[in-house]
Every structure is written in C-alpha cells, then in structure tokens.
Amino acid sequence: MDDRATTSRVSVLSYGLMVLGLAVLLVSTGPGADDRQGAVESSWIRAAAADDDPPPSGKDGQETDEPILGKDFPFEGPSERWPPRDRTPFPGRYADARHQAGNSRQADEAVGRALRWLAAHQSPDGRWEAGGFHHWCDGKPSRDEQPIDGQGKPLYDVGVTGLALAAYLGAGYTNRGDHDFAKTVGRGLKYLKDVQDPEGCFGPRSTQQYAYNHAAASLAMVEAYGMTGSPIFKGTAQRAVTFITQARNPYFAWRYGIKPGDNDTSITGWMGSVAMSARTINAAAIESGKPAPLVFEDTPIVDGIRNWLDKATDMETGRVGYLQRGTGPARPAGLVDRFPPERSESMTAVGVLLRIYGREHPAKSEIIQKGVKLCLDHLPVWNVIDGSIDMAYWHFATEALHQVGGEAWATWNDALQKALVDTQRRDTDACRFLGSWDPVGPWGPDGGRVYSTAMMALCLEAPYRYERVWAGD
C-alpha cells in the first residue's frame, strides 16, 4: 500500500477519534447530560459489543476517587427527574408514588440509614462480604481496631450482595443518576455479572445452598434490568432466568440443584419471586406496546408452584410445610432449640404470597385466608429471648400481607414497624453499626449483619416495592 495512503488513513482515523472524544465530553458534561446518558450507553455498547461491562462514563457505577458516602441526603431517589416514558414494571419505587404509599417517616428514614450502612461496607470489587464486611469503610480498608460483631459465612457473599442490591433497587436507586448510591449499585451489579457462569448461575456451586445465592442475585439483576432497560444487564438477566426455569422440577417447583426430583417451599419462595419479577417486566413491556424482553414461560412455572403448594399445604389449617405437608420451617443444625420452628410461619407466608402471584384472589381463596390468619397469629416482635425472630419469615409475610391489603396488612405493618424502627442500631457511625440491624434469628450466623440489614430494609420498603396483583378488585 502507498505510504501516503496509509498516512492519510491514520490522519482521518485520528481526526475521527478526536471528534468522537469531544462529542462524548460534551454529552457527558454539557446541559442535559443526564437525559442523554441512555444514548451514550447505547453507542458505547455498539462500539464494545464484545465486552458488555458498564460504560466508562462514571454514570453507571464506575470507580472514581470520590467517596462512596456523600452528604447526609434525604430519602429521595432520582425518579422526580427521570419519570418513566413507558409503563414501568415497578412504578411504586418512583419518589412521587413512594411518598403516597403510606409508609411512616420513621420507616423511610430507617431505610435511608440502612442503605448508607450498606454503602459503607461494600468491598472495592463490588460485593458485600457476609463475613468480611467489617474490613471496609467508605470503600477503603477500615482503620477501626475494635471488632464489629455480626459476621456471616463467606459462602453467602453472592447471596447477600443480591439482597443488598435488591434493597437499593426496591427504594428506587439504580446505577443511573446523580444520587449518592449510583456507584454503589453499579459496582454491585458488575460484580454479579463477573461471577455468573456460562449456564447462568451466579457464584460457585460448591455447596447445595448455592440455589439461594443464585436466587437472591437473580432478583437483583432481573429487577435492575427491568428498572433501567439497559442492554448491559439484559443478557445477564436472561441467563439467570433461564437457569431458574431449567432448574425447576417438571410439573413442580425447586430444591437444590437442577431438576433434583424433590422440592422445598423455602427455595421455591425465592425462585418464584424472581419468576414473578420477570413476569412483571414482560407485562409492563407488552402494556407499552413492546415485545416481552425476557424469554420466559410463565404458565408452566405458575402451575408447577401451585402443584407443589397443594401438596405441601394442610388444607384444614392452611399451614404450609417445608419438605412436605406437616413439616415446619428449616433450621440450621444446632439452632432448633434456640429458634423453635413452631414460632415461625415462614413457609405459610411463602404459600400465601405465591398463590396470590399465581392469580388466586385473597378474598376468594379459603386457603389464603387461613394462611393469613396464621401469620397474624405470629406477628413480628423483636424479642431476642423467645426465639421468635425469623427475618426470612418477616420478609415473605410482609410481601404476602401487603398483597392481601386491608386490615390484615395494616395490622401486620404496624407490628413490623414497631419491631424494626426502634431496634435499628443508632450508635457509633455507618462504618460500624449505625443503620444496621443485629443479625438475630436462625439465619443470622449464615448471612450476618449484611443479610439482616438488607432484609429488614426490604421489609420496610414493602408498601411501594411491588404493585398489588389484585389492586382495585
């Protein structure tokens, strides 16, 4: 090739790159930069199709020298500035709707403190460490020589990362916008992308409990995709959903592993929750005149869940069993006496929630009404002595009773807020305890303080996190 032609092509390429750089700079910093973020993201994705990490703009959670914890901001998300143009799958998470959800000011402030505590203890690689969260403060190694109790087990890092992200998303915070949590959420989502295997499973499968890690991580990734519509997350979310559908037992539900043959209500509650979020995302797209973005067959999953619940439910009492009808909720070895299963209706709460998601009307279903009564007979009370604290139960029952609505929901939510608002840690600062909940309960030793804080934040977000299936009926 002629040297002059080569030089000319290099010059044209250099000029083109310079113009592109100036254009990106103007888009990133000029007037209306936030509104143009989606266009920048799309062009970046086309230019780097082989590497779908978040775009290097700083708006989607990239590392910067800025501290993670910023000003002591009010409990507000970016949603006033970026109202959804289409039907959003989770409309209650936008600030205007959130304020109308009826949550108390104290509950909203508690959520804000919890999210600040979680941000303080995120690891630089984006994860939350169930057992090592205390090593980090504001994105840097902690200099605090005093121990922080509440460590969990490292094998649950992927799961508690998913729960922490779900808490941010539930309050309306994604990796986009100029709020103080954008980088926190972006780093967490990138971590999950990095630990997903080719089959779609998040994290290692070194223990049978990996299904819980996958479910929690999937919930976060699927909802992040639903809230942003970003192609950065679409493939990861699709693979996560595909793994869940392929792991389900034919005609029934889930247990540990892929189509293991047996079922349990606990992991079915988590997997079913992801499936319902995926269904909600598809329904919102269809309502906006767009094709369903996730490849997902809803009917077989709903039918399989109902088949399992019918098999596991005592039709006389409404109580749902763990592995079979008549069995109580699971407890870790050595903690059965400390946390008696009969003081929790966690499996019943899962049953109520999933039946409503399966389009059973709470006012017309006798079995749902029986389950609701059992939950109301076991209201949340922060009693560290009697072994009744079960955060997994509180989480599922809160979601279930919110779906039921009416007096049942008012009774439950009143008890829940009394149990949680005053027991949130208010001492020290966010780099130690401020904003967290002590990991009391049967699963505290596994998930630790990150688990307890994320789960209790999710409970307090329930009034606006999901729409009611039977709203208006």
List the model feature ranges, each with a label.
Residues T29-D473:
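Preference for long, amphipathic alpha-helical scaffolds in soluble/luminal domains
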